[in-house]
Amino acid sequence: AKVFWFSTTELKHLALGALLVMGVGLFFIHQIASNIQELMTTEILVILAIVFTLSFLLHELAHKISAQRFGLWAEFRLTMQGALITLLSMLLPIKIISPGAVMIAGPMTKESAGKTGLAGPLTNIILSTVCTIIAVTTQNTFLWIIAYINALIALFNLIPFGIMDGLKVFWWNKMVWAIAFGASLPLT
């Protein structure tokens, strides 16, 4: 399988997924930043919603690239249920961002499934850690929020339940799962 190749269908699904995530992002950012006066400008809220969307896209692309490196077919697809839940969560106090997922086909092993599942949350853990380190040294509130968003994305996805990334990682290697989950906890 080609690494970092996108079909027209996948690009359409990624674009629609990104729009849904950005919508939730605007509501979520407004919710968490409402007590921070300097972040309550329209420009800052939009920038944070874009960063939120990029964090989601990088998470999904990490899954895709990881699967493709294992020689598997991998493309992002919207799901009707996920898109509706994501859309509805704009109006709910709890935000659920799951407009779709990277669909993977081919002969997967427990290891390739686990490593591919880990790739998304690990990307968010790295982004959160880098932003936290810079935020600590610069006292930049904007970076704290980006770090927090990425930590939440990682933590939520590492829950070892159902179709979550965490279950694939847990089945593959419980120690790796514990380290990843443990790394995301203090970042939140």
Residue ranges and their predicted role:
Residues 1-188:
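Hydrophobic transmembrane alpha-helices and their immediate loop junctions
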